[in-house]
């Protein structure tokens, strides 16, 4: 991660610090950890935060992962901010010009991407090395191929291949496919592939394929489109088949040890060991005419006023856990009556780290709202109730 270390004996900084398209507006101090602060900054219209940590012998300044920037822009921001310090060490050198220019989709732009896309969508959730996903894109140039993956190394590997092979119809998104599906309108996908997911036989609630996931997949698929599971785990296959048979109307196709054109490294290893591999295709049979209404999920806040007394009480609030979602106030930062609230919240399957900014009586998410899913919206309403409770308490005690 780009960062730099600086000597402690620097003069107090005078904000704002402006250089070209960058502006470092002000510094928020942690109310929980006296050695931590957040620098509130912007690049053009994009807001981001830097973490500033005072250690025994130096300052550590690095990005805040909850407000990501493209790597080269982040390095440039840190290089500019570092000019106000006596730098001891850094890793802010410019990258080679041959570095990949292809970027993953941003979650905040994903809704617009889906809305604007007119081509049939082939989706793979958990694409690993990307062999199958890239073959899909090469063989279907008129269709949009979308890969969803959690792990950064897999995404970086596929992004390089997309650029090398000039696969303009292939896009990748970093996220949990279980939640991403919930944000997609009805009948947007032609096919969904889930190949060799982690079986999680001892922790089945962590599996990709669950009753909730299957319902969402069948909703998102076009009529006669299919969800394809490929697995070497017999128990996972059997449990998934039982889930499919729970539906009142089902069309299911099963294959065992079928030969397919693209074999992953993982699958090749099992083939050598003569291990059975199962294919389960579950077809979407019904058309859903009900309007997709995730726009009903409003992530704005009512008018709320925070002050030193209320944020002190909010910071002491324990993690609140409900069925399927939670809210945890991790930290609060302050600058002259303005507050940054650091949160972990949302769906248990994919918790989010994000920040809420309070300026005067306005409260809003920094940069982006949570992904529009039911459990995220429930967590948002819970957070709003927490903030309003202490706001109302302060008004009553005045």
Curated annotation (Swiss-Prot):
Record-level Gene Ontology MF annotations: tRNA (guanine(46)-N7)-methyltransferase activity
Chain sites annotated for binding S-adenosyl-L-methionine: 124, 149, 176
InterPro entries: SAM-dependent_MTases_sf, tRNA_(Gua-N-7)_MeTrfase_Trmb, tRNA_methyltr_TrmB_bact
Pathway(s) per entry: tRNA modification; N(7)-methylguanine-tRNA biosynthesis
Reactions this protein catalyses: guanosine(46) in tRNA + S-adenosyl-L-methionine = N(7)-methylguanosine(46) in tRNA + S-adenosyl-L-homocysteine
Role played: Catalyzes the formation of N(7)-methylguanine at position 46 (m7G46) in tRNA.
Protein name: tRNA (guanine-N(7)-)-methyltransferase
Organism encoding this protein: Helicobacter acinonychis (strain Sheeba)
